[in-house]
Amino acid sequence: MSKIIAVNAGSSTLKFKLYEMPEENVLAEGVIERIALPASHVEIKYGDGKKYEKTTDVKNHEQAIQILLDQLLDLDIIKEYSEINGVGHRVVAGGEYFDKSVVITPDVLKKIESLTELAPLHEPANVLGIKAFKKVLPDIISVAVFDTAFHATLPEKNFLYSLPYEYYEKYSARKYGFHGIGNRYVSQRAAELLGKPAEDLKMIITHLGAGASICPVKNGKSFDTSMGFTPVTGITMATRSGDVDPSLLAYVMEKEGMTDINEMIKVLNTKSGLLGISGVSADMREVEAAQATNPRAKVAREIYVNRIIRYVGAYLAEMGGADAIVFTAGVGENSITIRKEVAEGLNYFGIGVDNEKNDVRGVVRDISAKDSKIKTLLVPTDEELMIVRDVQTLANK
């Protein structure tokens, strides 16, 4: 029996989930927010619905980890630090270096640091978390689990852009994809639900959260993904644009007097998507609530659904059909109407949902209509569980 902690470090946040393995029992989970900012907030959920909260000052990630571990002791979740046998770090970009999870060595850490250009908003924070945990718990196994690794199986025809080939040779300019940790978990859980090995199935995973992507999985391996070199491409998201004609960006920059491309990249990442079109919110629930009286909210939602249908339809053609369409992540797990409308838009392919079965949120369920040729599944994602499983596998080698 061992205790393994899964960590997702952001620039000012530290999310964690502590598991007892191999039973996969969650002992505690929580977040430390506003690190290096005034009035940092600590929240830990544990036991049978218990919650600890505190507002304090947290100067950096190292102090955040120290506070977290001390609080786990105070709450009697652990008796001593040595009970924690391993830590798994979610790392956004693995580039072409990493096609699977790895034990973090000095050389591995250097390579991760060299990949910050691929995920400038996330990778530096991931590195901070790794270094901070190494300082506080230097003797335990530390594992990097990459969001891009699942997509290392993409064929060239799906990861190369139609740009001069030398850009790929010189700069590794290609599609990397994201949401890979969640995609891997969901594909395995969906296979269990269908009662078949993942290697014998074709499925399309629709990860619909604040960030959103579509991933066709063929014989247990990622075959393509709607996200690209960065997470901004693909379908419409909460604040990200999804696919846009690059020439339009140059046109708008000239009209708006923008001289720095990073200004436009910020617009694409933080001011577009549902928020940009609706002018109401990045939250689908608020957009849905406003659509009856707000035409922009209505069309934002229509664009969102239409882009999903477009990508799923293309991937169905590309893979020669599928055994299942799988909904996951915040919107996918909780929006009954989005699931219904996407299925209706794909009815031509023999996809449909049963209204009664679909009337649920956040559970594992087959929600297919009786006469469906392709199953429709609801599978909540669990990235943290995937991370700690990888840590345990590597620790046992």
Swiss-Prot record:
Its main location: cytoplasm. Gene3D superfamilies: 3.30.420.40. Keywords: ATP-binding, Cytoplasm, Kinase, Magnesium, Metal-binding, Nucleotide-binding, Transferase. ATP binds at residues 15, 207-211, 283-285, 330-334. One of its GO terms (molecular function) is ATP binding. It is found in: Cytoplasm. The keyword Magnesium applies. Pathway: Metabolic intermediate biosynthesis; acetyl-CoA biosynthesis; acetyl-CoA from acetate: step 1/2. The active site is at 147 (proton donor/acceptor). Mg(2+). Can also accept Mn(2+). It is an enzyme of class 2 (transferase). The record marks 179, 240 as: Transition state stabilizer. Mg(2+) binds at residues 8, 383. Its cofactor is Mg(2+); Mn(2+). This is Acetate kinase. It comes from Fructilactobacillus sanfranciscensis (Lactobacillus sanfranciscensis). The gene is ackA.
